[in-house]
Every structure is written in C-alpha cells, then in structure tokens.
Curated annotation (Swiss-Prot):
Source organism per UniProt: Acidovorax sp. (strain JS42)
Gly residues bias spans: 536-546
Name the record gives this protein: Chaperonin GroEL
SUPFAM superfamilies, sorted: GroEL apical domain-like, GroEL equatorial domain-like, GroEL-intermediate domain like
EC number: 5.6.1.7
InterPro entries in the cross-refs: Chaperonin_Cpn60_CS, Cpn60/GroEL, Cpn60/GroEL/TCP-1, GroEL-like_apical_dom_sf, GROEL-like_equatorial_sf, TCP-1-like_intermed_sf
Pfam families: Cpn60_TCP1
Family the UniProt entry places it in: Belongs to the chaperonin (HSP60) family.
Length: 546
C-alpha cells in the first residue's frame, strides 16, 4: 500500500479552500448575460468553447491532491444541481464558494464548526421557505419562453422554440435535442406513438413519394414471438380480408414462408398488410407491446395469457385511425384505446419512473409515458461549425431542463434578486446561540454572491448594485444585459424556483462538509529524484572479447 500524507486542522482546510477557489473562479466567469467563455482543451480535434458551468467544472482536475479534494467536492455541487434541476450549476458553485470563504474565516477565529453548520442549515431552511412563498406558477407560453431564454444565456430563439415544443406536445411530452442539418434551429413534432422499427420488406410500400406504407383505419395484430408459418396467420388474415380493412402485424419477427406470402398478397392487391418487428428487447419489448395494445385497444397475443394466433378474433386486434410505416420508423396516429386505460397505464409507468435506479431506465420510461400521453417533439439545433453546434446544443439542453423545472415548481425573480428578497425576509432570524447565529449571518451574506458575480462579469460595481437592489422592493432588480433597474418579471428575467432552491441547498450541504473537515488523507507524492538509475546496456563490440 502506498504511503499516505495526513494533514490536520487549519492547514487541511486552507488547502481545500484553495482548490474550491480555483474551480469556482473558473466556473463563475460564465455567470449572467455578460458571462465570459471558457475554452476547454480536447485530446483530439478542436477545443470546445463553453459558457456552461458544469462543463467547465467537469474538466478540472488539480495536481495537488488536497486542493483537488476541495475542487471535487464543489464539482459535486454543480453535478448534483444539474442532475436534480438541470440548470443553476454556476449559481450553486458561486454560493458554495461564498459560504466556504465566509465560514473558513469564522472557523479560523475559533468558532465551533458544528455550531456553524447548525446555523447554516437553519438559515437555508428559512430561505427555502421564503423562496417557495415568493414563487409564482408558470402558466403562459411567454413565461416559459422567458425562462428558456435566460437559461440559454439570453438567447431568445432558444426560449421560443422550447415554448413552441411544449405547446405542441404538452408539458409532459418528451422533447429531445438533436444535431440539425441547417444553420437555424428547427422544431419537428411527431404526433401519436412512434417507435424505431420499419417495414420488413420494401414491397409493402404503397406511397412511393414518401417511400412509406400508409394504412388508413387498420387493424393491429400484436404477437410476442416469431411468425414463420403462414398457416398460423390464415384465420386472422381471412377475418381482416372480410372486413376489407388493412392490417399491421407487429411481432418479434416475420420470416420465411409467412413473409413471402404476405408480400405476394400485397403485390397482387388481395390484402393490404404491413409487417414490422416489435420495438425494444427482452422485458422492454413486452412492456412496449403492452403499451401499443393499450393505445390501440387490442391485446398482445401471448401464450402465457392463453392466446394463440389460430384463435385470434377481430376483437383481439387493436385499431387506429392511421398508421405510417417508413424504412426506420412506424407511427401510430389516433389509436382506438380507451382514454381511462391509457391514463391508468401512464400512472403505472410514472410509479416505475420514481422507483427506477438508473438514468437510462428512467429515460426510457419517460419516453414511454410521452408516447402514450402526448407525442414527441424534436428540437434540431442548427449551427455553422461543429464547435458552435456542441456549445449551442449544451445550452438548449440546459434551457429545456430549466423550463421543465419552472413548470414543476414555478418561477421567482431572476438575476440573484429572489435570494436577496429571501435574505431580507429572514434578516432577524436568531437562535440565541452566538455561534449558530454566526452560521446564519454567513449564509445571509453569501446569498449576495450570485448578484455580485453577475454585476462583476458585466463590468459594474457589485456593492453599489447590491445596495440599490436591497433598497428596492418585490421584484425590483438589476438587468445586467442592458445595465438598467426595474421589475425583473416584467423584463422577463426569471429563474425556476426549483433551480434556485436546489443550488442553495446543495451549496450549503457541501460547504458545511468542508467547514467541518478536521483531517485529510491523501497519497504522498512520489519523489521522482530518488528513483533508481536505469541499468546499463550491453557493452559495445570492443567489450565482448572479440
């Protein structure tokens, strides 16, 4: 086992605080409408230019082990805030640095760190309560657009496209962000349920222009095994032919004789049939087949529930108004399933989302909810170069998360104003314990940090602006984009309550850990000069006794 260095007390905290400052100073230059860019080196290809706090934080690894521990703890603040609220990473980092900076002065002066921590916790609880009181529900498309714009570093086009997407697919619908092909951002909306499986044979195409098979008012057969024998399918095909309606077959696979017969019948115009593979794999495939069954009002034909292909009746088949099958995707529009059944299924999946442990599972479950509930909107981000594309895409994703957070918990005045108003509301909070009161005091001072940083990045004088804002009331604040004062909500400068709350709670949590640290253990640096000399090579020809 390698030797370890153990550092105690003030020295340990001082080294950690140095690490916190290095990371926070790199991150906080991106805060506000006039935030600066940070350039990140890449091992290959062009460097990345970003104004996204969490992207900067993730890149930082310090050589000094003890400094690095401090930096990694603050990186955790940014990542955690990003995971929960999807935005507010820079605000969280600035708050954490401010609480650590103020707190370490008190600890150095001999105050008890545990009492300071209790005071910090009490102040945070009181501030969060005030933020919730000040919160206003987001109802209009305009407010949603404003939240998106602020999060995307005051880019109004991003806010507008997110608001449009939410109008189209609802606030619960899935909105994904992809690379676009043009210079402009584009919005594409997929109505109904779409899954990523296309026709099994190009002979099924009946619309050459779209290169797709379009079925109007079709039946839908859902089967969870392979179909290779046409005899199994004959009873179903006969019933569908009598009803003179098209049929979509969704099965694990359709192959051999069965596929050939379907193709021949389609070409001859005897039947209008399309076969596609079922989406997903394993258990997820079964769940998605069940989703399609509920959406179309049909049943999944599976042996475990006692259903076989030979015994299928028209009542077991799903129905839809229209189905489009392309080379890679199938879209079911206006399924005939009962609204109550669909709602019950959505509720069931939501419970699974809450219980899901991995991000991947959660994402897939959310996609299933959206496909059942509202549809999917795709925002295609346009840019001139790949470097710009990456930066823009990261901002759009941030803005999307912030907008979702605003819909969830409402909005407060942006630009650091909400925290100042909360500070004024709890200004006379006291515990009767001087050391805990010091903890409260340091948090109330630290909440000024985001506004101070926004002003500093815009080239203003932070103290002057903070005093001016504190003298105002309600949503009165400073618009750093054009150096004016006024009502923040009217100027469209809003923050989601969830983002501000999460940033404050996570910053205080990690800062408290740093302040109550009394010892640090890290691997001792290896002494390069003490390395043994390399053994000599073989002698030349003259030394070999020739």
């Amino acid at each position: 086992m390698a030797a370890k260095d153990v550092v105690f007390g003030g020295e340990a905290r001082a080294r950690m605080v140095e690490g916190v400052n290095i990371l926070a100073n790199a991150v906080k230059v991106t805060l506000g409408p006039k935030g600066r860019n940070v350039v990140l080196e890449r091992s290959f290809g062009a460097p990345t230019v970003t104004k996204d706090g969490v992207s900067v934080a993730k890149e930082i690894e310090l050589k000094d082990k003890l400094q690095n521990m401090g930096a990694q703890l603050v990186k955790e603040v940014a990542s955690k805030t990003n995971d929960i609220a999807g935005d507010g990473t820079t605000t969280a980092t600035v708050l954490a640095q401010a609480i650590v900076r103020e707190g370490s002065k008190y600890v150095a002066a001999g105050l008890n760190p545990m009492d300071l921590k209790r005071g910090i916790d009490k102040a945070v609880v009181a501030l969060v309560e005030e933020l919730k009181k000040a919160s206003k529900a987001t109802t209009t498309s305009k407010e949603i657009a404003q939240v998106g714009s602020i999060s995307a570093n005051s880019d109004e086009s991003v806010g507008k496209i997110i608001a449009d997407a939410m109008d189209k697919v609802g606030k619960e619908g899935v909105i994904t962000v992809e690379d676009g092909k043009s210079l402009e951002n584009e919005l594409e909306v997929v109505e109904g349920m779409q899954f990523d499986r296309g026709y099994l044979s190009p002979y099924f195409i009946n619309n050459p222009e779209k290169q797709a098979a379009i079925l109007d008012n079709p039946f839908v057969l859902l089967f969870d095994k392979k179909i290779s024998n046409i005899r199994d399918l004959l009873p179903t095909l006969e019933q569908v032919a009598k009803a003179s309606r098209p049929l979509l077959i969704i099965a694990e696979d359709v192959e051999g004789e069965a596929l050939a017969t379907l193709v021949v019948n389609t070409i001859r115009g005897i039947l209008k049939v399309v076969a596609v593979k079922a989406p997903g794999f394993g258990d997820r495939r079964k769940a998605m087949l069940e989703d399609i069954a509920i959406l179309t009002g049909g049943k999944v034909i599976a042996e475990e529930v006692g259903l076989t292909l030979e015994k299928v009746t028209l009542a077991d088949l799903g129905q839809a108004k229209r189905i489009e099958v392309g080379k890679e995707n199938t879209t079911i529009i206006d399924g005939a399933g009962a609204a109550a059944d669909i709602e019950a299924r959505v509720k069931q999946i939501r419970i699974q989302i809450e219980e899901a442990t991995s991000d991947y599972d959660r994402e897939k479950l959310q996609e299933r909810v959206a496909k059942l509930a509202g549809g999917v909107a795709v925002i295609k981000v346009g840019a001139a170069t790949e470097v710009e594309m990456k930066e823009k895409k990261a901002r759009v994703e941030d803005a999307l998360h912030a907008t979702r957070a605003a819909v969830e918990e409402g909005i407060v005045a942006g630009g650091g104003v909400a925290l100042l108003r909360a500070k004024q509301a709890v200004g006379n909070l006291s515990t009767g314990n001087p050391e805990q009161d010091a903890g409260i005091k340091l948090v109330l001072k630290a909440v000024e940090a985001p506004l101070r940083e926004i002003v500093a990045n815009a080239g203003g004088e932070p103290s002057v602006v903070v005093n001016e804002v504190l003298n105002g009331k309600g949503n009165y604040g400073f618009n750093a984009a054009n150096d004016t004062y006024g009502d923040m909500l009217e100027m469209g400068i809003l923050d989601p309550t969830k983002v501000t709350r999460t940033a404050l709670q996570n910053a205080a949590s990690v800062a408290s850990l740093l302040l109550t640290t009394e010892a640090m253990v890290a691997e001792a640096p290896k002494d390069e000069s003490a390395a043994p000399a390399m053994p000599g090579g073989m002698g030349g020809m003259g030394d070999m006794g020739m």
